[in-house]
Regions:
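Insoluble glucan recognition modules
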Residues: 1-187
Length: 187
């Protein structure tokens, strides 16, 4: 016996499986791999957020200075004349210490923030053990992913944020799915 339902019209809008959040805004400076405008290396990119005029970058920097600029060009650039978190057009270089950061710029309020932002592996299977420091992931801003090259021995590991147990992931049930505060992962 055949069964029929009422006809329903729907509209389907296809989209790319890869969501492009890129912008023309970038991080440049002596603290970046490209230095102060190496023509062969692009500025570290910012990405759009859900908030208009707010952009975010995840960058690994060395000791040095940075600025923000548009289109890998100096015609539009921002620094910070008072080292107070205010974006100043053509402002002073921003001094930074080595580390991995989340940088957020807000062009509506003309402000920026920088906060430490790192992911790592900790545990008895790492060379540093449970006491850390964590074996760090490095953010690849050109492919938008976190990567680590580590040698693990027999033991257990967990993933955690900023070398702290406040945010950590394990695997309850050893099913390959990470859970917040989950069980240690056997290696």
């Amino acid at each position: 016996q055949e069964i029929y339902s009422n006809t329903v019209n729907i509209t389907v809008t296809p989209y790319s499986s890869l969501l492009d959040l890129s912008t023309s805004l970038g991080v440049v400076g002596s603290a970046t791999p490209g230095g102060w405008g190496n023509e062969n290396i692009l500025d570290l990119p910012f990405y759009t957020t859900a908030t208009t005029n707010v952009y975010v970058a995840y960058v690994t920097l060395r000791n040095g200075e940075i600025k923000f600029r548009n289109n890998n060009d100096w015609s539009e650039n921002w620094g910070d004349d008072g080292a107070d978190g205010t974006l100043d057009s053509y402002g002073a270089n921003i001094a930074v210490s080595a580390g991995t950061y989340k940088i957020e710029v807000n062009f509506s309020s003309m402000t920026y923030t920088m906060e430490e932002y790192s992911w790592g592996i900790v545990g008895s299977a790492t060379t540093n053990g449970w006491g850390g420091p964590d074996m760090m992931f490095h953010y690849n801003s050109f492919q938008d992913d976190w990567r680590a090259v580590v040698t693990l021995g027999d033991g257990e590991v967990k993933f955690r944020f900023n070398n702290d147990w406040g945010v950590n992931y394990g695997d309850d049930g050893a099913d390959g799915t990470m859970e917040a505060n989950g069980a240690n992962i056997a290696v």
